[in-house]
Regions:
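Acidic, Ser/Thr- and proline-rich intrinsically disordered linker/docking segments
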Residues: 2-3, 9-89
C-alpha cells in the first residue's frame, strides 16, 4: 500500500521545498525524530505550524536505501503506514 507523506526536501545550495511523496509502507525500515534546526526553521518559514513535528524515515529501494525528512512525529508516521484501507465494491 502506498502512503502519501509530505517531505521536506533541500537541494544542494537551494531553499527547503515541500513535496508530496508516496511511499510503500513495506519499504520504510526506520522512523526517528528529526531535529536538524536549520532545515526545520526554513520549513516553518514556509508556513508550517511551529508546533509541527518532523521525522526522518529510511526507505529501502531495490537494494539501496535513502532517507527523507517528513512532516509528522514518528508515532504519527507509524500510524499512517499501518493504516488499513477498506476496499469497496
Amino acid at each position: 500500500m502506498l502512503v502519501k507523506l509530505v517531505e521536506l526536501h533541500k537541494p544542494e545550495g537551494d531553499r527547503v521545498h515541500l513535496d508530496e511523496i508516496y511511499v510503500s509502507s513495506a519499504a520504510v525500515t526506520t522512523i526517528r525524530t528529526e531535529s536538524g534546526a536549520t532545515m526545520l526553521e526554513e520549513a516553518r518559514q514556509l508556513g508550517i505550524n511551529g508546533e509541527a513535528k518532523f521525522s526522518r524515515i529510511t526507505i529501502s529501494e531495490g537494494g539501496m536505501t535513502r532517507t527523507a525528512v517528513v512532516v509528522g512525529s514518528p508515532s504519527e508516521i507509524k500510524t499512517k503506514l499501518n493504516k488499513k484501507m477498506l476496499l469497496r465494491d
